[in-house]
Regions:
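C-terminal transmembrane beta-barrel domains of outer membrane proteins
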Residues: 52, 125-136, 141-178, 189, ...
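Transmembrane beta-strand segments of outer-membrane beta-barrel domains in Gram-negative
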Residues: 11-15, 22-24, 37-44, 51-54, ...
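Periplasmic polypeptide-binding modules associated with outer-membrane biogenesis and secretion
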Residues: 1-119, 188, 366
Length: 456
């Protein structure tokens, strides 16, 4: 069969598919030879409809192109359902098909609320957030999200000149475009890559008895998937984080930060820029079976992650002959910036024995190297061991680095290298109960001999 004509119906009612009311058309237009029928107002730009179409008039019918079209429209958050129907052209000796792309509009705007209570060692608190989401911001299925969050916790046992309780306020805004956006790139390339582009801003204000901290960030990233959703890629083209410490309690500073043995802790309570780029890759052999919650069977997952920070800033500072501060660091707007390389690898495999028993294997490794403008990693980029997702015989952040036993007074059990491995036998017991036997192995280490982490 040859494709004769392709038409769009944007207000298809899938719940009334068997009745005449399933298609309501009050108006129409033609765009680049494609008829577009709609009810009251066209909620998607015609260019968005045609750019995601892979069924071309005058070409042979191709099932792969039909599935690609379904996949493209499935990525548009403004749509709820997509149905493509083909009808033979009623002509003698004709082998032509008319295609109708029938789209069902989704809910474009929503507001959500969340409330939670906390109890940290007897200190009670509460948190609340409100989020607004618009899934068709500029009539191109762009998803805009804005979120506000607030938290409060009564902190006992600490005397401070700053504040006696914990208060947190945060705001977040992101916008996601269902297409690849970059200057000087051809339209044909943008159509082929099928990536989404995301821009985001975040602001977080924290007030504790020990300190006041502000974290602000901005990001620009791309995401796309291939091979029937088995592979997923993400590129963080630019991710800027700014850590600002406007005030630190004098007692906390004297007891912890000004001691030579707490160099790692002091480093993480200083103002700092982190300007990074990164790439991550996920491969899941289950593919769409995992998304559809259907029987998965034997499967495995591979995760790779690589990121670097500070290299461009360091090169500019070096070539520009900029002066270093008293700590021997180059600065951006008088604020030191981090510089490091970090890579992670993770492999997990699920082996089904029968409908009640299975084996799970896991291996993970990571290394992060501070260099150039930094002698240490930022706290958020260091590795931790112990807890439910690591070596389960230790509490979270309570193992390592190396043979270092840790200090209960400060959170200095972190490192630059991490290895984790486990094997687990899982079985169904009865009703909703499951059982498991597992063996875990792993630890973290430091690349350098830090004096406040002997044996690390």
């Amino acid at each position: 069969y040859t494709i004769n004509k392709v038409s769009f119906i944007t207000d298809y009612n899938v719940l009334q598919a068997s009745t005449q009311n399933s298609i309501e058309v009050n108006d129409s237009l033609h765009y680049k030879g494609f008829p577009i029928y709609y009810k009251d107002k066209l909620y998607l730009r015609p260019k968005v409809l045609t750019n995601n179409l892979r069924i071309t008039p005058g070409t042979l019918y191709n099932e792969q192109n039909v599935q690609r079209t379904y996949s493209n429209y499935g990525r548009l958050q403004a749509l709820k359902y997509t149905n493509i129907r083909f009808f033979e052209v009623q002509q003698s000796d004709s082998a032509k098909l008319n295609a109708y792309v029938m789209l069902t509009r989704g809910k474009h705007q929503s507001v959500s609320f969340e409330v939670e209570g906390t109890n940290s060692a007897g200190d009670l608190g509460a948190a609340a957030s409100v989020a607004f989401q618009h899934r068709n911001m500029f009539k191109g299925s762009e998803t805009f999200m804005f979120k506000l969050r607030g938290a409060y916790e009564a902190v006992s046992g600490l005397q401070s000149s700053l504040n006696q309780d914990y208060i947190e306020l945060g705001a977040e805004a992101t916008i996601n475009f269902p297409r690849f956006m970059f200057p000087f790139v051809s339209s044909d390339f943008k159509r082929r890559i099928r990536a989404t582009t995301e821009f985001g801003l975040q602001y977080n204000y924290q007030m504790r008895p020990e300190f006041t901290r502000i974290v602000a960030s901005a990001g620009w990233s791309y995401k796309w998937g291939v091979q029937q959703q088995r592979s997923q890629h993400r590129i963080d083209l630019l991710d800027i984080n700014y850590l600002y410490m406007p005030s630190i309690d004098q007692t906390f500073k004297e007891d912890y930060l000004e001691k030579d043995e707490n160099y790692i802790l002091k480093y993480n309570y200083e103002d700092r820029f982190i300007v990074r780029t990164g790439y991550s890759y996920i491969y899941n052999s289950a593919g769409r079976a995992l998304m559809n919650n259907s029987g998965i069977g034997n499967s495995y997952t591979i995760r790779l992650n690589f990121e670097s920070a500070g290299n461009l800033l360091y090169a500019v500072a070096k070539l520009g002959g900029m002066k270093k501060n008293a700590s021997g660091e180059y600065t951006l707007l008088n604020i030191p910036f981090a510089q490091y390389l970090k890579g992670d690898f993770d492999f997990a495999k699920n082996l089904v024995i029968d409908n009640r028993n299975s084996l799970a294997f896991h291996f993970g490794a990571g290394i992060a190297i501070p260099y150039g403008n930094a002698t240490m990693l930022p706290f958020e980029k260091r590795y931790f061991s112990g807890g439910a997702n690591s070596v389960r015989g230790w509490s979270v952040r309570n193992l390592g680095p190396g043979s270092f036993p840790g200090d209960n007074n400060v959170m200095n059990q972190s490192g630059d290298i991490k290895l984790d491995a486990s094997i687990e036998y899982r079985t169904r017991l009865f009703w909703k109960f499951r059982g498991a036997l597992f063996v875990d192995a792993g630890n973290i280490w430091t690349i350098r001999d830090y004096k406040d982490q002997p044996g690390g």
